[in-house]
Structures are given as C-alpha cells and as structure tokens.
Amino acid sequence: MAETVWAVFPPMLTIVLALATKEVYMSLLIGIFSGAMLYTDFNVLQTILTMFAVMEEKVGKNVNILVFLVILGIIVAAITRSGATAAYGSWAAKHIKGKRSSLLLTALLGLVIFIDDYFNCLTVGTVMRPITDKFKVSGAKLAYIIDATAAPVCILAPVSSWAAAVGSSLPEGSTIDGFGLFLQTIPINLYAILAMVFMVFIAWTGRDFGAMAAVVREERTSSAADEYSGDDDVKESKKVGKGTIADLMLPIFVLIAACVFGMLYTGGIMEGKGIADAFADCDSSKSLVLGSFIAFVFMALLYLPRRVISFNHFCECFGIGFKAMVPAIFILCLAWTMSGIVSDKYLNLGGYVGGIVNANASLGIFLPAIFFVVAMFLAFATGTSWGTFGILIPIAVAVVGVENYQGLVLAVASILSGAVAGDHASPISDTTILASAGAQCNHIEHVNTQLPYVLLVAACSFVGYIVDGITQNGWAGLGAGLICMAAVCAVIYTKLPVVEKDDK
C-alpha cells in the first residue's frame, strides 16, 4: 500500500486521536502500528518487527538531540536548584511591568536565537518561564510565543541550520546556488513573516480567541497560574542554593556561544571555510550536544567552587533534569518513528503527494498557492518541515524549470512557507513538542490553542501566494498578505475583548 492514498491514513489517524482523546502517547503508538500494518499487508509479527526497526533507525539517527535534551534538562534543574531562577524572577518582578512586557520580551528573545529551532524552543522557555510565571501568563500562551519564534524565525535567517536544509534539498547535480536561492525566498516567505506579525499583535493587545481565550479565562478565574505550571519532576528542583541573576545568565550565554561555536566547528570553520559556508555545512545536532556539554562544564565550575550549590545537590540535578525531559523524549521518539513509517522507504506519503502535485502542474499561475497547501498538509501529516523540503523542492525544480528562475523562487518560497505552517500546527512536530516542553505546557493543550492562530495566518499567506502566482511578483504577494493580516488584526482588535489583561 506504499505511495497510495492509504499512506495518508496513519498520520491522520494519529492527529485525530490525539486531538479527540488528548492522549498523545497512545495516539502515536496506534498510528505507528496502523502504518506498519498497512506496510506489511496486515502481518502482525512483521508489523511489530517493522515498528521497532523503524524506531531503531530513526532514534539512532537523532540520538544527539536526545543527549542535548538530557544535558539541557540537567542545566535547567541545576539553575533552578541554585536559586538563580528565583533571583531572576524577583529581578523581573521589579523591572518588567506586566504580562505584555513579559510576552514581548519572550518574543524578542525568540527572534534573537535564530540559529536552530530546537535550541530556540528550550532556551527561550528556560529563560522566560520564571518571568511569565511571575505574571501568571498561561502556559499555552507562552508555548505559542515560543513556537511562533522558533521555525518561523529560523527559516528567515541566512545563518541557521535551516538554510543548510534548503540547499541540501535541491536535486543532485543541480546547477542552482542553493544558498542564493534561499536568500531570495526570505522576503516572500509569507507564513513566517505573517506568523511573527500576528504573534506580536496578540502579545501586545492581549486579545485572544478560540481555545486560547478559553484557557486564559479559565486560568484567570481559577488562579491555576498562581502555582508554577511545570511538571512535578521540575518542581522537585527546589531552590536550595544562593544563586544570583549572573548564575542564570552566564550559563545561558555560554550555552548560546558554545552552540554557535559548535556549528561553526562542525561546519569546517577551522578548515578555512567562511562563516556562511560553515553554518550551511554544520551538523546542528552534534553542535547542540557540544555546546550544551561545554555549558554544563562551565556551570559546574561556576557553581561548585563558590558553593552556590552543594556537590550532593548538584548531583541530584542529573536525575531531576533527566526525568523532566522524559515526556518530550518519549514523544519525539514516537514522532520520529511515525515520520519513518510514512517515509519513502515504507509507505512513501511524499511520493503520493508528489504525484498529485505533478498531476496539477498545468494550473500554472496557481502553482505557488498549490505548493503552499500541499507543503502545509505534508508537514502537518508527517511532523517534519525538513522532510517536506526534501520531497517538494525537487518536484518544484522539475515542474517550474531552472530557466524560469523567478517562478522557481516563488515556488520554493511557498514550499518553505507551507512546510513551516504545517510544522507549526502539527501535534507530532519536533518543534511543537519542544515548545510545549519549554513552556511546561500540556502538549495537546498547546496544539489546540495555537491551531486557530496558525490557520488564520495560513489563510492570509494563501491569499498572498495566489497574488504571487497571478503577478509573478513576490513583493505583490507580500503586500497582499500584509493587507489581509492587517484587516484580520483590525477586526480582532475592534470586535474582541481583552482576555490576557496586562496586570501590573
């Protein structure tokens, strides 16, 4: 049943079950099992073997990400246990005035950390959660801000791991300059641009709607946000030390600097490559492990000699940090397995979707809009934007042709935009999972609350890509998308009440 309509069934079953039952683990397991059943023609024994073979392959390829998560969990636990987080929260309560300021500062930090989406999600959550907790900001709202400044920011940054992913998705032997093509897609990556515009609007005005408004109202009336919103495992990491703000900021600064250094190092900066080429060729997951380990060693040397925290309490952070990351690790492993089941090696969902795109190539002026919708669906169903790049960009090159370079730029931009939109909405996406982990928010609650926002921004982006196709001018599409977004924001501002009040 490979490369047929049945390839759509497992991810869609997973998503429907997750949204209906709010049980993401079981939903993923059922979806993976159904996909393996389809692949093995309902041979139960082969289904089980296939499931674990795919899991072994996918988790093995991503083990560096898991190590990074564990080390980061330990760092967060140690920072909290040292008392540095409490000191930072006290400082924030005096200097940051209200929810609006805390959310805008979260957004600003997300814009600054553009090198990698995984790193962005967890670092922004670690730094900003003490502040947003002080002002009783809903965990779902924080997760939305984190998610909206992860992939959408990275896909617009020339110096990021995402630029490399786009270049590597071009057909083998292509004469196209991948990095140059990526640079030209930046101003017409409509979803990424509009998502950040809308996110700032929501943070500034406090006007929420849909599931997000319901969650914010519930937390305001029940005072559920009076307590720290994290998991019990994170709560175990109580303050026992005498840390200061510097004991939080210095490890985070070293973490950022070390990860940037890791990307340059693994990309070949020491071999004479330029900065842009080094970022393009880096091994981002290995870089994150290297950077997090350097930050961990630095933190130990910063804390222990000064007796900010005792050696025994520091060692306790190993178990606490690991336990805090177990839910995210488990979901990631299952999500990677699901993406493996629908990969070209098994059910080949990408091949099926690619066939649909090729069959509609004659629609001409609507190609950017078609690529946007198809990329969004594919990323939503598989949970991977990079995989979507790899499937659809070669198809765009074949359909549009290198000779129509402006048309190719529009097509690739719409693919990148749609992939980020689908990734942003998908409950089985890595970045969605990590945004939930960074905000210590229930994962399905995060998916439910941000989905209406994603769809609204995607609709404005779709309008922009229709204009792009008609005019063959990316700036015209950007203008149309911004006008559409401005109209939506005006309606929300005039018709909806303030839900997230800016309490001082």
Name each model-derived stretch.
Residues A93-F179, A381-A421, T431-E445, M485, ...:
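Hydrophobic transmembrane alpha-helices that form the pore/transport pathway of multi-pass ion
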Residues K134-F135, V326-F330, L334-Y346, A361-F389, ...:
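C-terminal transmembrane helix pair
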Residues M1-I74, A87-W91, H95, V254-L334, ...:
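Hydrophobic transmembrane alpha-helices of multi-pass solute/ion transporters
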Residues A2, T40-E57, A164-I188, F209-K239, ...:
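Inter-helical loop and helix-membrane interface segments of multi-pass membrane transporters/permeases
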Residues P10-A20, G31-L38, F68-A77, A107-I113, ...:
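Hydrophobic core segments of alpha-helical transmembrane domains in multi-pass membrane transport
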Residues F182, A195-D281, F293, V297-C317, ...:
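Long, contiguous bundles of hydrophobic transmembrane helices that form the permeation core
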Residues V44-A143, V308-E403:
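Membrane-embedded alpha-helical segments and adjacent helix-loop junctions characteristic
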Residues I131-S223, S237-D247, T432-C489:
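Membrane-core helix-loop-helix motifs of multi-pass transport proteins
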